[in-house]
Amino acid sequence: LVAESQSKFVGAFFGFSVEDPYPEIDLDAVPECFRPCIELERVASGCWLLQAIAILPQYRGKGLARQLLGKAESVAKDSGTNRIALQVEEVNEVAFKTYQSNGYVEVDRRPYVHFPGSEDTGDVVLMWKELN
């Protein structure tokens, strides 16, 4: 789904339902940089996983991310699940606080493993929210 402001595309999100039970994956066959996310996805089996949410920089701070988050929660609920999950890097403080203020709680975390060319540090955090 997308967010619009004055008929302009300004943001979007996408996600999917995580299989339950989670499929068996040989982590040794997976590049190391992907392992933390796969391990956390396994913890989120049965959830609807918000894989990405983004707002163009010039439109941030206007409540659009919260609106998109609400739409994602509706999509998750309509899919038949009672929980929405997401992964966020702990260094992304703005996103982390936005999720917390919208009822998401930390469930698990894994140390971030660098992608080639990345200098990110810290943990990847799995958060989720119960949907009523």
Predicted segments with their positions:
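Conserved acetyl-CoA-binding loop-helix of GNAT-fold acetyltransferases
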Residues: 55, 61-74, 78, 97-101
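C-terminal "cap" of GNAT-fold acetyltransferases
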Residues: 32, 82-85, 89-96, 101-103, ...
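Conserved S-adenosyl-L-methionine
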Residues: 108-109
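Active-site beta-strand termini and strand-to-loop segments that position acidic
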Residues: 4-6, 129-130
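Conserved beta-strand in the GNAT
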Residues: 2, 8-17, 49, 54
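A short, internal acetyl-CoA/4′-phosphopantetheine-binding micro-motif in the GNAT/acyltransferase core
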Residues: 4, 32-33, 53-60, 89
